Swiss-Prot record:
Family per record: Belongs to the disproportionating enzyme family.
GO biological process: glycogen biosynthetic process; glycogen catabolic process; maltose catabolic process
GO molecular function: 4-alpha-glucanotransferase activity
A Pfam family assignment: Glyco_hydro_77
This protein's UniProt keywords: Carbohydrate metabolism, Cytoplasm, Glycosyltransferase, Transferase
Main enzyme class: transferase
UniProt source species: Escherichia coli (strain K12)
GO annotation, cellular component aspect: cytosol
Entry EC number(s): 2.4.1.25
Catalyzed chemical reaction(s): Transfers a segment of a (1->4)-alpha-D-glucan to a new position in an acceptor, which may be glucose or a (1->4)-alpha-D-glucan
Source superkingdom: Bacteria
Main location per the UniProt record: cytoplasm
Name the record gives this protein: 4-alpha-glucanotransferase
Amino acid sequence: MESKRLDNAALAAGISPNYINAHGKPQSISAETKRRLLDAMHQRTATKVAVTPVPNVMVYTSGKKMPMVVEGSGEYSWLLTTEEGTQYKGHVTGGKAFNLPTKLPEGYHTLTLTQDDQRAHCRVIVAPKRCYEPQALLNKQKLWGACVQLYTLRSEKNWGIGDFGDLKAMLVDVAKRGGSFIGLNPIHALYPANPESASPYSPSSRRWLNVIYIDVNAVEDFHLSEEAQAWWQLPTTQQTLQQARDADWVDYSTVTALKMTALRMAWKGFAQRDDEQMAAFRQFVAEQGDSLFWQAAFDALHAQQVKEDEMRWGWPAWPEMYQNVDSPEVRQFCEEHRDDVDFYLWLQWLAYSQFAACWEISQGYEMPIGLYRDLAVGVAEGGAETWCDRELYCLKASVGAPPDILGPLGQNWGLPPMDPHIITARAYEPFIELLRANMQNCGALRIDHVMSMLRLWWIPYGETADQGAYVHYPVDDLLSILALESKRHRCMVIGEDLGTVPVEIVGKLRSSGVYSYKVLYFENDHEKTFRAPKAYPEQSMAVAATHDLPTLRGYWECGDLTLGKTLGLYPDEVVLRGLYQDRELAKQGLLDALHKYGCLPKRAGHKASLMSMTPTLNRGLQRYIADSNSALLGLQPEDWLDMAEPVNIPGTSYQYKNWRRKLSATLESMFADDGVNKLLKDLDRRRRAAAKKK
C-alpha cells in the first residue's frame, strides 16, 4: 500500500516511473529516488494556494476556442480585463464551462470570478501559435553568421579577454562580409569575487550580465579619473595588462583584478555626477527593481566574504546570518555598504548599455538577426538567483543526463532545477521574466538543452546521475509563452536539441516555430552516410561543431579522442578503440559526401586515412554546411583559423582549462588575412546560391 501511495505521489508530481536506457530498454526508477525527489520539491508550498473555482493560470492559442471550466456551485459573475484595459463581462454557473471571447488579443489578461464576497483570479495568457521569424527567413533567404565564445576574442585593445568593444568591432567586420549575426555563449552574470568559476553554463544568475565583458576603454569616467589614469600609466599596470593580453588562455583572476581596480576608480567619479548619465543610471535601477538590487547586494556581500575567507565560494559557505536574503544582517550589510552595492548596480548598467550599443550597431548595418544570445539550462547552487529565491529552486536536487555507453554513471551538472509546481503556482512569472531578460537587445535566442521545457533529469543531491529520474514540465504552456515573448521582442528561437530527444517534443518544437540545431558531425546514419546538404531541414541552424565538440582540425585528427585518453575520460580501451574506429568510418563517409556534392576539387584525395587536414579540406567541410537547406548557418572563427584545441571538454573540470582557450589571432589580423577573407567570400556566395536553388 505504501509503495502504491509513493508511486502515485511521484506520478502526480511529474516524476517518470522509468526511462529508456542507453541500450534501448526501459529502466525503472527506485523508490528511494522517488522519495528523495518528492522531498526536494516544494509541492506543499505550491498546493497551499486555496482551492478556487478557476485555476490561477490558463494558457490559450490565439484564434482557437478558449474554454474555462468553473468549479463549485451557484452563480458567478465574471469580469475579464485585458492588458490594454478592455473589459468583458458575463455570468456562469458553477460546475459548467464557458468560452472566453474569441477576439481576445494576444497577451496577459486577468479573469476575476465573483460570488457574494468571494473573489477568484485567473491569469489568462493568449499566445500566437508560432515564435517570431525575421522577414529575411520568411523570404527564404539563407543566412550565415559567426558563433563566438566572447571571452576567446583577442584584439590589440582588450584587457586579456574578449569584451563588448570587441563584439562591436566584430559585428562590423562580419556584416561587411555578408554575415547576418554573431551568436554568443551565455553572457549571464558569473562571480566577480570568484573569477575562476568561469563556466558560462553555471551562472550566478540568468537575469543579469557578466560584468567581465565591460569594455573599460569605453567608460568615460575611467578616462576622466586622474587616479585611474595615473594607475593606467604605471609600468606594472601596462606589464600585467600586456601579459594578460598575450596569454593563450584567459587569466580570469588577473583580468578581473585589472578591470575591478579601474572600474572602482571610475565609479568614484561617476558617483559625484548630477547629470543625465546619473539620471539614466538611477532610472535603470528603479525600473529593474528587486531582482537587480539583490544581484548587486549578492556581489557586494560575496566580495566581502571572500576577503575574510577565500573558501567562501557561494552563499552556502557564508556565515548562516548571511545565507537568507531576508535576514536583518543582510539588510544591515546593504545599508552599511550602500556604496559597494551601488558600484555593482552601476556595473550591471554599464554592461547593459554596452551590450545595447552592440545591438544598435548590428541594426545600423541592417543585419537580419544581429545578435543571438544563449540561455543556459540552469543556475549554480551558490549564486545570486538561488540566494534570492530558495522556493523556486530545488536545492536538494541537481540536473544532468542519464547514463549512456560513454558515461555509465551519467552526468551531474550541479545545477539545482526550477520547481515546475512553483512555476505554475506563480502563473509562469519566473519563466516570463527569464525570457524577457534574455530576449533584450538580440534578434535570436538559443535555448540550451531545449528538452528541459518538456523534462529534466533530476538527481537527488549528493548522488551520482544514475540515481536520477526524469521530471516533467508543462511543455505546451511553456512553448506558448515562449512564442508570445518571442513575437513581442521580435526575437526568433533556436532550440539546442542534441542528445536524447524524446519523440513527443520534436513535433511540438517544429510547430511552435523553434529552429532545430544540426551539427555536421552527427548528421549521418549507421552506415556513416552523411545527410545531403539539400536534405537539411529548412527550420534549422547548421553548424560544423559546438563549444562542446572538437574543431574541424581536432575532429579530423582525432585530437579530442587523444586528449580524452590522456585525461582518463573513457571507461576502458575497448570503448576508446570503438570510438577511433567509428571516427575513421565517419571521416570516410564525410569525405565521400564532400566529393559527391561538389565541395572538394576532383583532384583531392578520396581515402580519408591518407588525408591530413589542409586548407582545401577545411574549406570543403564548411562549404558542405554552407550549401545546406538550413535557413541559418553558424561558422566558428576557430575553423577559419584552422585551430585544433577545444574550448571545453565535457566531463572535465580541473583536468582541462575549460572556457579559457583564446583564438589564435587578433580580430584585426584575422579580418586582414587573405585566406580568411577568401573563405568567407566563398561561403557567403554559396549561401546566396543555396537560397536560389530552392
